[in-house]
From Swiss-Prot:
It holds the Pfam family Ribosomal_60s. PANTHER family: 60S ACIDIC RIBOSOMAL PROTEIN P1, LARGE RIBOSOMAL SUBUNIT PROTEIN P1. It comes from Penicillium crustosum (Blue mold fungus). CDD domains: Ribosomal_P1 (cd05831). Plays an important role in the elongation step of protein synthesis. This is Large ribosomal subunit protein P1.
């Protein structure tokens, strides 16, 4: 991320944490107060439009949680384990067959 994106992101998080509505003017005010010089005003308006009407706190609390997933039947999970073991055995056999058999490329 660029400095401008980080500054706008942090400003939006500060506003959301204080319960203040996120707007381009408020983001720009926070960026100016932080003495960040490299941010063009367009970034503040882009972030304000992107976050308009969204609950930032809810977004942050739901980042790690996934939607409900359907549970796999117990029999299917048990059948998958032997298949994985067979795949591992095949991989090991391939490694053994790659050993040097005395034939060189330039012999």
């Amino acid at each position: 991320m660029s400095t401008a994106e980080l500054a706008c992101s942090y400003a939006a998080l500060i506003l959301a944490d204080d319960g203040i509505e996120i707007s381009a003017d408020k983001i720009q005010t926070l960026i100016s107060a932080a003495n960040v010089q490299e941010v063009e005003p367009i970034w503040a308006s882009i972030f304000a439009r992107a976050l308009e009407g969204k609950d930032i706190k809810e977004l942050l609390t739901n980042v790690g949680s996934a939607g409900p997933a359907s549970a796999a039947p117990a029999g299917a999970a048990g059948a998958a384990a032997p298949a994985e073991e067979k795949a591992e055995e095949k991989e090991e056999e391939k490694e053994e067959s790659d050993e040097d058999m005395g034939f060189g490329l330039f012999d």
